[in-house]
Every structure is written in C-alpha cells, then in structure tokens.
C-alpha cells in the first residue's frame, strides 16, 4: 500500500519533461478516515476540486501551449493523489506533443481516473478565457471578527458545542485563519473555510478556537476538511452540514475540498484573493 512517507514529498526529485503517467502517486483515503471514525461508506458527499495553474505542452509543430485546468475528484474515490506527484506529472507534459487541448484533457482524465479509482472531471481553459476567471471571497458571516483567546494549536474538538435547547438556525460561517501543515514535510498550508449548517446554533467562539487549533496539525487538505466535518457533525449534531475549504496554491496547484451531509451541487471552483 502506498503511504505518504513513500511519496516524493520532502525529497529531491528529477523533473521529467516527457509525458509519464507513472509519476502519479495515489494514497488510500481509508487509513486517515479510520482515525476519525469513518469506515465503510462515508457519511458525507462531495469532492476535491483542484486547480492547475502551470499546465503546458507542445502542439504538433512544437509550439508551446498553456492552459489552466480544473480537476474534480469525487470523495467516494478510494484514493487521493499526492500533490507533489501531481505537479511532477503535469510537468511531464512540458515537452510532449499533443494534437490539441482536448487530447491533453482526455489524457489527464484517464490518468487521474486510474490513480484515484473513480471517474474525475477535467476542464481546461485556454488564454482566451483567462480574464473570465473571477476572484471572490467565501460568502458568510466571518468568525474572524471575534476577539477570542486561542491556546490550543492541535485539533481540540472539545471546543465545539451547540445550543441544543434553543430553536434551530440556518447559518453560514467563514474564517480565513485555517492553517495546518503538510503531513510529511511539515510545511505550512494556508486556507480559508466555510461552514454551512442547519440545526442547533453552534457556539461561534468555540468554533473559531477549534479551527485555529489545526495550526500545528500535520495532515493533508482533504483529511483536515473531513476531520472538521466529522467533529462538527458528531459534537454539534446539525441536521445538515457542509464544510468547504480553499487552500493557497503550492507548486502551481491548489486543492479545495468540499464535504456535505446531503447530496447537492458542488460550489463553483472560484479562487480567492490569497490563491
């Protein structure tokens, strides 16, 4: 079984500029999910939405082409792709000739499908569409307005509680203070998070302190979002819950996981100012 420690993270890597799908390094989701009590079918839906900002290849005459790519990996997939391997894989397109962007798109789709064990979505955008890529902050009431004392810097779910004796509410809360660290290298990962729910009102001070408590925690983006979802779901017992995080890019890639308790359309993959 592939483990994060066997990946290229934190190691010197040769940059290959001829297409090589074997560079992709899948990691099973199951082990980290078991840590948060998720075995079998997960109690959530959603996807991991990737944006690739450094995609380039050669056309059939050797002229470089560039594009952005949006890749959507369903959370039902048994595997994720380790992000450095994804970067190295995309770099392998650099001196490889493809007939057109569709050929590139279909090649990426087939390779990521095989790596994660599920069907993924891939969309490419050429330079003529770059100015249509908007920038927008997460909608909702900012928790960051609260003046709270923070003393926990590893996940502290005991900070979460809700007003079970009060009428239920519908709320969307956001924070730009999410930070965790790469599971293998310990490098900082910076993110913003949006939590939407229906049910007993969640104490906002405790929720903000809980989100801050990820600050020294080592885990991949997808795993952090699932941990947040499960902690809020079990401790605050909402009727409905969605957790959406957008992380700043590294190596030309950003990862934006979304998890929800009920089937719904994915949020638009619109980058934030920090991305």
Swiss-Prot record:
Disulfide bonds: none annotated. Pathway: tRNA modification; tRNA-queuosine biosynthesis. The active site is at 182 (thioimide intermediate), 189 (proton donor). Coiled coil: none annotated. GO terms for molecular function: preQ1 synthase activity. InterPro entries: GTP-CH-I_C/QueF (IPR043133), NADPH_dep_7-cyano-7-deazaG_red (IPR050084), QueF (IPR029500), QueF_N (IPR029139), QueF_type2 (IPR016428). This is NADPH-dependent 7-cyano-7-deazaguanine reductase. NADPH binds at residues 83-84, 250-251. Transmembrane segments: none annotated. It is found in: Cytoplasm. Its EC number is 1.7.1.13. The gene is queF. It catalyses: 7-aminomethyl-7-carbaguanine + 2 NADP(+) = 7-cyano-7-deazaguanine + 2 NADPH + 3 H(+).
